[in-house]
Curated annotation (Swiss-Prot):
HAMAP family: K_H_efflux_KefB (MF_01412). GO terms for biological process: proton transmembrane transport. Pore-forming subunit of a potassium efflux system that confers protection against electrophiles. Catalyzes K(+)/H(+) antiport. The lineage of its organism: Bacteria, Pseudomonadati, Pseudomonadota, Gammaproteobacteria, Enterobacterales. The keyword Isomerase does not apply. It comes from Salmonella paratyphi C (strain RKS4594). The gene is kefB. This is Glutathione-regulated potassium-efflux system protein KefB.
Length: 601
């Protein structure tokens, strides 16, 4: 693709995203489906603005690559080891069972047995990009079903390697003398990457961070991700797997959050490009000529994968209310099918329109998932939020609440219990199905739903409520909800949970002054007790705690413009020295005053 054509394609992609995604959100069908429809519109079978789909699709895989790097940052090696049973147990069972059933059906549809095996394996895979995106949107990533879903996706990425190696063997074109030397060199190169990354990455990023230039840090992060992807691609392995490993190696480093912040904007944009490219690849000509075959294939594919996943979730012990979400979010075909089927086609395994039919089936199955998840959400909302079957009076009246509490994790539970103990009328919203079921057993009136949806807030009583307390786990959800309330319910008094200083800065910039850093108050209290244990009078320790809180908050406000810049490091050091000096002067003055308390703890 020439430079001018590339620029034109970029403009078209951005225009399609800007036009389609807000429209999709307004229609309530989700951003992912909006991207897919935008791709169909501008692709060769739509308006025909872009015709070179294969090249763009390969480039757009970088969105999946960046996503897997961020996921790797969220998992340390010990956590990955804890997931080994679900990865190699449930993940392997899903791929093998689904592939076997689908391959059998393809043989009944006049596919050669070799082509049926490849087709079954390809269709058994799910879309990593779509599933992870939907799991984040639905709040599944921290639930048991979300963890199991991630394990299945990770095994599927690992299965890419043997699946690609199987194609030439099935085609009968494999060398009689297998080149073990090449295999050994690939294994050696992979080992070098692991060992080198384990011992070199942190010193390298420490050196780069010392420069204090954020742009260089961002460039180094991009270099790491793209190099890992290129290296794995050269070895014939999954690019996404390479960047995932790089993320895991840096998961325990002090630069984890900075790395995530540097990558996040690129990840979102490239993921959108990936979904648009998938939509562009939909061959409407094949769809028109084989409409019944394709429609039946999509339904059969989704149903078989859902049944398999539901059965495995039940055997694994997932709660019944979470099984449908787990089965639905992984029910589509995936991006790996494009690679596997292209490889099989080059080996002449497919006949006639067989490859085109399979690719159309995969693409359409991806379009069904957002709609399926939306339908299941409505069903779960009706099931969980409907009238109680028993006559027990709920703790919380849901009509005209004074306060809406968003999130009912450990943080939100403390707040809700305090409010209920003081006879406040509250409505609690939670999107973790397991938490909703568990808390309802204890008598709490908790409602299932995504609070970032305006209609849900309105039905929860936001127009009549006085305050909203936001205790979301994800900072992105918190900021989205803040903006939503400020736009649609400006009368609400917003109180929010901040996980750390960065989130506190973002809340202050958004105009939210009432927030609590989740570990700050408890850390201060433990610090006060430590001072008392070292011999300080409780009165002085209490005053020291109050001084520290006030001065730290002042410095927090002063650093607002610099919270996203590496300059904050040097300013924070200066602020710490200033804090110590002011604190020392005030405490010296305090010691000259009479003690207010006489009793020690």
């Amino acid at each position: 693709m020439e430079g001018a054509d590339l620029l034109t394609a970029g403009v078209l992609f951005l225009f399609a995203a800007v036009a389609a995604v807000p429209l999709a959100a307004r229609l309530g069908i989700g951003a992912v489906l909006g991207y897919l429809l935008a791709g169909i519109a501008i692709g060769p079978w739509g308006l025909g603005f872009i015709s070179d789909v294969d090249e763009i699709l390969h480039f757009s895989e970088l969105g999946v690559v960046f996503l897997m790097f961020i996921i790797g940052l969220e998992l340390n090696p010990s956590r990955l080891w804890q997931l080994r049973r679900s990865i190699f147990g449930v993940g392997a069972a899903q791929v093998l069972l689904s592939a076997a059933v689908l391959a059998g059906l393809l043989m009944l549809a006049d596919f050669l047995w070799q082509a049926a095996v490849v087709g079954g394996i390809g269709l058994a895979m799910s879309s990593t990009a779509m599933a992870l995106q939907l799991m984040r949107e639905k709040g599944m990533n921290r639930s048991e079903s979300g963890q199991l879903g991630f394990s299945v996706l990770l095994f599927q990425d690992l299965a890419v390697i043997p699946a690609l190696a199987l194609v030439p063997l099935l085609a009968g074109s494999a060398d009689e003398h297998f080149d073990w030397f090449k295999v050994a060199m690939k294994v050696l190169a992979f080992a070098v990457m692991l060992i080198g990354g384990r011992y070199l990455l942190r010193p390298v990023f420490r050196f780069i961070a010392a420069s204090g230039v954020r742009e260089v840090f961002t460039a180094a992060t991009l270099l790491l991700v793209l190099s890992a992807a290129l290296f794995m691609d050269a070895l014939g392995l999954s690019m996404a797997l390479g960047t995932f490993i790089a993320g895991v190696l840096l998961a325990e480093s002090e630069y984890r959050h900075e790395l995530e912040n540097a990558i996040d904007p690129f990840k979102g944009l490239l993921l959108g490009l990936f979904f648009i490219s998938v939509g562009m690849s939909l061959n409407l000509g094949v769809l028109y000529t084989h409409l019944l075959w394709v429609a039946a294939s999509v339904v059969i594919l989704v149903v078989i994968k859902m049944l398999t996943l539901y059965l495995l979730a039940r055997l694994y012990g997932i709660r019944s209310s979470e099984r449908m979400q787990f089965a639905s979010v992984l029910s589509q075909g995936g991006e790996f099918a494009f690679v596997l089927f292209s490889t099989a086609s080059s080996q002449r395994l497919f006949q006639g329109d067989q490859m085109a039919l399979l690719l159309v089936t995969v693409t359409l199955s991806m379009m069904t998932t957002p709609l399926l998840m939306k339908g299941i959400d409505k069903w779960l909302s009706h099931r969980l939020n409907g009238p109680e079957e028993n006559d027990e009076k709920p703790w919380v009246e849901d009509d005209k609440p004074q306060v809406i509490v968003v999130g009912f994790g450990r943080f939100g539970q403390v707040i809700a219990r305090l409010l209920m103990a003081n006879k406040m009328r509250i409505t609690v919203l939670e999107r973790d199905i397991g938490a909703v079921n568990l808390m309802r057993k204890y008598g709490y009136k908790v409602y299932y739903g995504d609070a970032t949806q305006v209609e849900l807030l309105r039905s929860a009583g936001a127009e009549a409520a006085e305050s909203i307390v936001i205790t979301c786990n994800e900072p992105e959800d918190t900021m989205k909800l803040v903006a939503l309330c400020q736009q649609h319910f400006p009368h609400l008094h917003i109180l929010a949970r901040a996980r750390g200083r960065v989130e506190a800065h973002e809340l202050l910039q958004a105009g939210v002054t009432q927030f609590s850093r989740e570990t700050f108050s408890s850390a201060l209290e433990l610090g006060r007790k430590t001072l008392v244990s070292l011999g300080m009078h409780p009165h002085q320790a209490q005053r020291a705690q109050l001084h520290f809180r006030r001065l730290d908050m002042r410095i927090l406000r002063e650093l607002i413009p610099e919270h996203s810049d590496m300059v904050q490091i040097s300013r924070a050091r200066e602020a710490r020295r200033e804090l110590e000096e002011i604190f020392q002067r005030e405490m010296q003055q305090e010691r000259r005053q009479l003690d207010g308390w006489d009793e020690f703890e």
